[in-house]
């Protein structure tokens, strides 16, 4: 599948929710139902076993071999790949952080790759994301 980086605030086809917001919500719902793999090792295993339904890769990964590996596995098995600009942002979205009293993320750990194996319940965010992936 073709991969491309999502620009901040890029409008979704339906116009109700942008793709980044939809992706954030879908990742949170997948985490709730234990359908989220985080980190290169877990993601590579899920991609190789073909249990992955969607792969999210940070664009600023410090090791180019990681990027090539994930892109190759996604292309080989026909899994959709979405790139986000920052690994810290992806780390916050997949729960690799502490939340303080005000609800702000603290001590965010960067995440190079995340894979969704189970989406969880059907939602508007999932529909927006699927429409976006179909149009690419």
Swiss-Prot record:
Pfam families: Ribosomal_L7Ae. InterPro entries: Ribosomal_eL30-like_sf, Ribosomal_eL8/eL30/eS12/Gad45, Ribosomal_eS12, Ribosomal_eS12_CS. Keywords: Ribonucleoprotein, Ribosomal protein. One of its GO terms (molecular function) is structural constituent of ribosome. One of its GO terms (biological process) is translation. GO terms for cellular component: ribonucleoprotein complex; ribosome. Belongs to the eukaryotic ribosomal protein eS12 family. PANTHER family: 40S RIBOSOMAL PROTEIN S12 (PTHR11843). This is Small ribosomal subunit protein eS12. The lineage of its organism: Eukaryota, Glaucocystophyceae, Cyanophoraceae, Cyanophora.
